Amino acid sequence: MQLSALTLDRVNRPGSSSGGCTVTERNYLDFRIDGCSVLNILTSTDGTHSDFMTPFVSGFPQQHQTFVADLLCRDLPEGGAARVIIYICPECGDIGCGAYSVEIERSDIGIVWGSFAYENGYESPLPISDIGPFLFDPDEYKRIIIEAPALC
């Protein structure tokens, strides 16, 4: 498996208010793999809307630390894997509104993202095929994830 490049990109979700409906402005970091937005890859493959954001959203520093720990799989032994929510509802952050997740594995060759899925917390995750797996250099991956909260 070839190494992929993980980067983060600042994104602004504009706010608005019309007809009694308010959309909250959000600034967040989007995951990019080899230059492509992971959200765009997921929504174009899955055929759903793209109104999601990562938990690296401005104004929620406590959430950032939890997300960093989840992405680094700190509690897993090498060879272990964990499913991590990577995109959430931009209004409330509740998985019940729908979310995208990925299985993250710490292997002897690096960090692997695979088995992407859409989930809502009350049904089994719905696998999204034809995406990944992606292999990342473990040191570079760790650096990017640890530095992310400072970029929010």
Label each residue range with its predicted role.
Residues 1-152:
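Intrinsically disordered, low-complexity acidic regions enriched in Pro/Ser/Thr
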